[in-house]
Amino acid sequence: MWIKELQLRNFRNYGTVDTEFSPGLNVFIGNNAQGKTNFLEAIYFLALTRSHRTRTDKELIQFSKNNLQLIGKLNRISGALSLELQLSDKGRITKINALKQARLSDYIGTMMVVLFAPEDLQLIKGAPSLRRKFIDIDLGQIKPIYLSDLSNYNYVLKQRNTYLKTISTINSDFLSVLDEQLADYGSKVIKHRIDFIGELTREANKHHEAISNGLESLIITYESSVTQQDHQTIKEAFLLNLQKNRQRDIFKKNTSIGPHRDDIHFFINDMNANFASQGQHRSLILSLKMAEVSLMKEMTGDNPILLLDDVMSELDNTRQIKLLETVINENVQTFITTTSLDHLLHLPDKIKTFHVNQGTLKAD
């Protein structure tokens, strides 16, 4: 898939912008703080209805305005369509072909994106919540049912935690009902994640071995409080663990186990990647991003759109070649932000460049 045209209204430092893109490489050039990253953020926000930079939606709306609108014209394997996202103090409105979407799971995944930004290095050493978010974003785009299962799980989890916090005398029967629901939805979430991590490891290791000239292997593991593989046995083990931890949960007034506390770990040549070098970290994340692209194509039949936010200058000659070979050979529409073309050493002849200056966009 590729985005042919994008219209921005009141997004960050952009007032009104209408522009068309190349189905191949699109490069945004400009000094810092001019709006290059904002433009990639707009594409990301249109795809996922959330920003990768802030949790405060109000920050996305241009100063002194009270709403924003994004409209994208998308070409997919299945045909052309339009996406629209409106944001105001009343909330979000999402539309596909001008038809309002009632559920996020009906909208997310229509346009798939993979973002590669400098902060992705935090995936290795950062908090577990970052790695769970990484899984949720990928799976949410690939499998709409995952978003539904995750939403249901989070709803029951919130109910259970609220009950534990506010009720002085616990009704064991009612808590058992919540436990049953939590285990049902939670086991589905865990099963989705286990399957996905298995596929991700396969693809990421393939790319990592190529980047390291066969010297390194990459393994990704999913760490859960439940280790079984199929939905039913996961559910049974989940319920058993909830029962074992019930008194602890009542005392601490929260739910101590479940996919909301799970984590993933990375190993290079069987060594925890936390102890790897900075160069190895870059190779790992690059392998991960290329694996995301490969998996989305494999599991949906269509390419995602790749957003490279100020990362090319962080990659050496070998890594740049590997990344650009992948996106060019696989016909992946790619957006790159940079302050200069000088360190983009291996760009093909046919690229579309945009010069960004104080919220204005000029195509060459």
UniProtKB/Swiss-Prot annotation:
GO terms for cellular component: cytoplasm. Its main location: cytoplasm. Pfam families: SMC_N (PF02463). GO terms for biological process: DNA replication; DNA synthesis involved in DNA repair; double-strand break repair; SOS response. Signal peptide: none annotated. It is found in: Cytoplasm. ATP binds at G30, N31, N32, A33, Q34, G35, K36, T37. InterPro entries: DNA-binding_RecF, DNA-binding_RecF_CS, P-loop_NTPase, RecF/RecN/SMC_N, RecF_2. One of its GO terms (molecular function) is ATP binding. Keywords: ATP-binding, Cytoplasm, DNA damage, DNA repair, DNA replication, DNA-binding, Nucleotide-binding, SOS response. Belongs to the RecF family. The RecF protein is involved in DNA metabolism; it is required for DNA replication and normal SOS inducibility. RecF binds preferentially to single-stranded, linear DNA. It also seems to bind ATP. PANTHER family: DNA REPLICATION AND REPAIR PROTEIN RECF. This is DNA replication and repair protein RecF. It comes from Streptococcus uberis (strain ATCC BAA-854 / 0140J). The gene is recF.
